[in-house]
From Swiss-Prot:
Organism: Bartonella quintana (strain Toulouse) (Rochalimaea quintana)
GO-annotated biological processes: cell division; proteolysis involved in protein catabolic process
Protein function: ATP-dependent specificity component of the Clp protease. It directs the protease to specific substrates. Can perform chaperone functions in the absence of ClpP.
Pfam families assigned to the protein according to its UniProt record, in alphabetical order: AAA_2, ClpB_D2-small, zf-C4_ClpX
Key words, A-Z: ATP-binding, Chaperone, Metal-binding, Nucleotide-binding, Zinc
GO molecular function, one term: zinc ion binding
Self-association and partners: Component of the ClpX-ClpP complex. Forms a hexameric ring that, in the presence of ATP, binds to fourteen ClpP subunits assembled into a disk-like structure with a central cavity, resembling the structure of eukaryotic proteasomes.
Residues covered by the ClpX-type ZB domain: 5-58
Designated name of the protein: ATP-dependent Clp protease ATP-binding subunit ClpX
One Gene Ontology cellular component annotation held by this UniProt entry: HslUV protease complex
Domain of life of the organism encoding this protein: Bacteria
SUPFAM superfamilies in the cross-refs: Glucocorticoid receptor-like (DNA-binding domain) (SSF57716), P-loop containing nucleoside triphosphate hydrolases (SSF52540)
Length: 424
């Protein structure tokens, strides 16, 4: 009976966290307040929530707009490398929203909008940069694929549908939508199909460029609230696109040859000078980009004129891809480690294994976009087996596993019975 009494008194003296309900024996530290207790785990969780809120909403400057330094600091947490592109984007976005914040204060000088063109190899982070920027500024964001767009009246998507998507992202709040960001991907695919204007209409190339001119510069777009094609009986929402920031991105495959060959005069005969091929990587060649190169590629001068800010992105090397795998907040390695944690298993990668994964992605010429498919292939069998295996504590991935020369190393935890046998 005395034992029961002692256990009852012990349970009364045990303190519990007022938030998660864990006892003082289950946590490292329990902090007492006037009437409540909070454990160290709940404190860490609260700090994580506050940090994420600060990151998602952005740290506002005095005039309500994040400074370029604050924007680039947040970008560094999510995007590896591309320092030049980050600087160009952070300054451009800061100036754009500073212009909107001071628009009503002075009427003497009207500041024009500066849309942005991102040029870089596939998988180098163009789309991700635009998405992260919208999250920092906390404005509605939508992404459109230029390959699906056609001129009005033809089968395909009208350019007005881009504004409709932005309106949907703003929960049909027109005022918020008019300050949003639109990212148009694969803009290189709407280049003119030939150097000279064709007799037949190019409805998915030059025609789309012509259709985009007005909404990029600023116009009142009539948007059908339900989407789809317009009809006379339908009511329209009027959206002013003057203050919407347009960011266009594309890989521009073959543009590097136009840049390298600019100004070259070809000659034949024994006196002809033989020029060595440009051995620079694509990202380095893109740094010398001029508007005339984009015109030769197939963009019309009026379209290029609507994109005064050009940010070129570099190729990702092995070191950059290894950093992308492991360092950002939502890095691929961390994502798969979280998946394995759900099975109470620790996932570990050797450093040389990450380098082999990065080299495979470079060989595929898919940049950072190809990393996930490589990781899936490596971990497929392990993720299939784990839910049915018992006692697995840790899975280790080496370079041989990535190359297909070995299986992942499974480390099992000691069973309770084994421990008792050893102690006996």
């Amino acid at each position: 009976m005395s034992k029961i009494g002692n256990s009852g008194s012990e349970s009364k003296n045990t303190l519990y966290c007022s938030f998660c309900g864990k006892s003082q024996h289950e946590v490292r530290k329990l902090i007492a307040g006037p009437t409540v207790f909070i454990c160290d785990e709940c404190v860490e969780l609260c700090m994580d929530i506050i940090r994420e809120e600060n990151k998602s909403s952005g740290i506002k400057a005095r005039d309500g707009v994040p400074t370029p330094q604050e924007i680039i600091t947040v970008l560094d947490d999510y995007v590896i490398g591309q320092q030049h592109a980050k600087r160009v984007l952070s300054v451009a976005v800061h100036n754009h929203y500073k212009r909107l914040a001071h628009q009503s204060k002075s009427n003497d000088i009207e500041l024009a909008k500066s849309n942005i063109l991102l040029v870089g190899p596939t998988g180098c982070g163009k789309t991700y940069l635009a998405q992260t920027l919208a999250r920092i500024i906390d404005v509605p964001f939508t992404m459109a694929d230029a390959t699906t767009l056609t001129e009005a009246g033809y089968v395909g998507e009208d350019v007005e549908n881009i504004i409709l998507k932005l309106l949907q992202a703003a929960d049909y709040n027109v005022e918020r939508a008019q300050r949003g960001i639109v990212y148009i991907d694969e803009v290189d695919k709407i280049s003119r199909k030939a150097d000279n204007p064709s007799i037949t209409r190019d409805v998915s190339g030059e025609g789309v460029q012509q259709a985009l001119l007005k909404i990029m510069e600023g116009t009142i777009a009539s948007v059908p609230p339900q989407g789809g094609r317009k009809h006379p009986q339908q009511e329209f929402l009027q959206v002013n696109t003057t203050n919407i920031l347009f960011i266009c991105g594309g890989a521009f495959a073959g543009l590097e040859r136009i840049i390298s060959g600019r100004g070259e005069k070809t000659s034949i005969g024994f006196s002809a000078t033989v020029k060595a091929p440009d051995e620079r990587c694509v990202g380095e060649i893109f740094r010398d980009l001029e508007p005339e190169d984009l015109i030769k590629f197939g963009l019309i001068p009026e379209f290029i004129g609507r994109l005064p800010i050009v940010a070129t992105l570099e190729d990702l090397d092995v070191n950059a891809l290894v950093q992308i795998l492991s360092q950002p907040k939502n890095a691929l390695v961390k994502q798969y480690q979280r998946l394995f944690e759900m099975e109470n298993v620790e996932l570990a990668f050797h450093e040389d294994a990450l380098r082999v994964i990065a080299k495979k992605a470079i060989e595929r010429k898919t940049g950072a976009r190809g990393l996930r498919s490589i990781m899936e292939k490596i971990l497929l069998e392990t993720m299939f087996e784990l839910p049915t295996l018992e006692g697995v504590q840790k899975v280790v991935i080496s370079s041989d596993v990535v190359d297909g020369k070995a299986r992942p190393l499974y480390i099992y935890s000691e069973r309770v019975e084994d421990k008792e046998n050893v102690s006996a």
